[in-house]
């Protein structure tokens, strides 16, 4: 800031000195003589700034407003800042130059928003100087430029503390006593969410949606789970919380309501209960769907130590030698041949394969119609009559009587065995007739794979009745040298084969009905083709 020492202020600048003394004629002569109007001293102060700062008054000096007006008319820049960042407008507000000087500066382009190095603008300095005229001109200038001015002043209350007041279109801050103190620290479990139901009144306040409960939340969760229409998962969780032991709640830690170990134990109990419930449901379903069966002599019927017993049908077909039979009948015939030994119990699997041939006969063996009525009795007679077993089959247990065997032979199994044994007498002199299907072969039936022996489960099929001769000679176990019959071999490929028995000759002449567990589409087509050939 300049002082009264003109020599120090002007630094030999005649223009600044003439302005400082308020000599209008001298200033005009200097400017007309070529002096630079925006020239500054070592502090960066220009002639316009000096005119706003000076307070020198004598008989030859003029007023500040006239000097400022003359300098502005000669294109003095009002927005030049000195080294401290202050403009001529800021200096006029600090020195309280008056409203007229401020108005002249604003009319000639002075910017009231420019700030100095401390971040204060002309508005701040006008407020601090308590110059109401200058402040009024500044506010009018800001509004004219479309700027909204907010003035913030500090005041001291009666207690000596500073308070803040706001003006100009800004709502005042609420008083301290009007502010609601925040509620006590609450955990998420303390907050009860209520949905507006259909039966609730329309005049219910919004404050009721979120309510804080002062007591322990775990003690009332059971009642909330019963009353509110929440989701099933939420009800289960609330009931689980109700069953847990009450823990002491700390004032400093409102969130630790339940220990993790208690939650883990409760979760394990719920899982065990859920698993037991599932087991009960499965057990009840199994009791309804699956009837109990009689006792079996061997429980693990599929446990075989010989892995070679289970061959696929394709492997068996590849082992059959080539014969003179036609290709179409031969492939299906070779696929359907297999030996079937007598089994002592249902649920057992033969270990060795039976090797026996087919006796000679003609196509006239299929002449008599079959009947479903006598099949069950025939199978029962086969099981109870004593006689030698096939060479490589499992023998009957000697300790079991006829009544025990009757229990083990159910009606739905006898239908299948009767239909299979009734076809053992169909002749074939082809060299491939010496090999028949082993009992352990698997065949696709319906939607699953079943064993083609007495452990397989059968249902009455829908095959048309065929004519069968029930009095053929005993099958010869040696290979036959007679020429093969294409018709008989074709019949064997389309009809399932039953296990052979040496007691077949002693059976009474009865009508047999050929049955199959289930039929595939290809086999049904072959049967229809065979019926056309027979007709």
UniProtKB/Swiss-Prot annotation:
One Gene Ontology CC term in the entry: pi-body
SUPFAM superfamilies named among the record's database cross-references: Ankyrin repeat
ANK repeat segments: 10-39, 43-80, 84-114, 118-147
Region described as Disordered: 159-181, 214-237, 381-444
Gene3D superfamilies linked: Ankyrin repeat-containing domain
Pfam families, sorted: Ank_2 (PF12796)
Record flagged with keyword ATP-binding: no
Biased composition regions of type Polar residues, renumbered to the chain: 216-225
PROSITE patterns in the record: ANK_REP_REGION, ANK_REPEAT
Keywords for this protein: ANK repeat, Phosphoprotein, Repeat
Parts forming coiled coils: none
Residue numbers carrying Phosphoserine: 301, 447
Family affiliation: Belongs to the ANKRD34 family.
PANTHER family: ANK_REP_REGION DOMAIN-CONTAINING PROTEIN, ANKYRIN REPEAT DOMAIN 34C
Record-given protein name: Ankyrin repeat domain-containing protein 34C
Organism placement in taxonomy: Eukaryota, Metazoa, Chordata, Craniata, Vertebrata
């Amino acid at each position: 800031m300049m002082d009264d020492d003109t020599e120090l202020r002007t630094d030999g600048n005649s223009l600044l000195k003439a302005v400082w003394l308020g000599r209008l004629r001298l200033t005009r002569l200097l400017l007309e003589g070529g002096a630079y109007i925006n020239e500054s001293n070592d502090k960066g102060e220009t002639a316009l700034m000096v005119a706003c700062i000076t307070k020198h008054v004598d008989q030859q000096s003029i007023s500040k407003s006239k000097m400022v007006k003359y300098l502005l008319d000669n294109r003095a820049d009002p927005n030049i800042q000195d080294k401290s960042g202050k403009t001529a407008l800021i200096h006029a507000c600090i020195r309280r130059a008056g409203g007229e000087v401020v108005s002249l500066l604003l009319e000639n382009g002075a910017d009231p928003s420019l700030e100095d190095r401390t971040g204060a603008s002309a508005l701040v300095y006008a407020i601090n100087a308590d110059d109401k005229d200058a402040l009024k001109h500044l506010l009018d200038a800001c509004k004219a430029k479309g700027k909204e001015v907010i003035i913030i002043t500090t005041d001291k209350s009666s207690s000596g503390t500073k308070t803040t007041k706001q003006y100009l279109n800004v709502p005042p801050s609420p008083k301290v006593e009007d502010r609601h103190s925040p509620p006590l620290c609450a955990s998420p479990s303390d907050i009860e969410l209520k949905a507006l139901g259909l039966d609730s009144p329309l005049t219910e306040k919004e404050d009721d949606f979120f309510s804080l409960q002062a007591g322990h939340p775990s003690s009332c969760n059971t009642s909330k789970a019963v009353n509110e229409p929440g989701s099933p998962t939420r009800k289960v969780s609330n009931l689980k919380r109700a069953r847990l032991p009450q823990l002491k709640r700390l004032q400093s830690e409102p969130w630790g309501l339940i220990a993790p170990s208690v939650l883990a134990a409760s979760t394990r109990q719920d899982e065990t209960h859920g698993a037991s419930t599932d087991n009960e449901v499965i057990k009840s379903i199994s009791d309804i769907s699956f009837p109990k069966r009689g006792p079996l002599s061997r429980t693990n019927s599929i446990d075989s130590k010989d892995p070679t017993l289970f061959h696929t049908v394709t492997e068996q077909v590849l082992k059959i030698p080539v014969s003179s039979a036609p290709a179409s009948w031969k492939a299906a015939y070779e696929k359907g041949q297999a030996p079937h030994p007598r089994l002592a119990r249902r649920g057992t699997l033969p270990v060795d394969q039976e090797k026996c041939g087919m006796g000679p006969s003609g196509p006239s063996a299929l002449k008599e119609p079959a009947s479903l009525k006598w099949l069950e009795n025939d199978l029962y007679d086969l099981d109870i009559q004593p006689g030698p077993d096939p060479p490589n089959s499992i023998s009957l247990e000697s300790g079991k009587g006829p009544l025990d065997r009757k229990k083990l032979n159910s009606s739905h199994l006898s239908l299948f065995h009767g239909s299979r044994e009734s076809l053992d007498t169909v002749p074939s002199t082809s060299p491939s007739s010496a090999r028949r299907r082993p009992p352990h072969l698997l065949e696709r039936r319906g939607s699953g794979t079943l064993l083609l022996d007495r452990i397989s489960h059968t249902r009455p099929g829908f095959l048309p009745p065929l004519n069968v001769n029930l009095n053929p000679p005993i099958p010869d176990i040696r290979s036959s040298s007679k020429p093969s019959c294409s018709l008989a071999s074709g019949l064997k490929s389309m009809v399932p084969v039953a296990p052979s028995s040496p007691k077949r000759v002693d059976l009474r002449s009865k009508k047999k009905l050929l049955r199959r567990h289930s039929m595939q589409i290809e086999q049904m087509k072959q049967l229809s083709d065979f019926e056309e050939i027979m007709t």
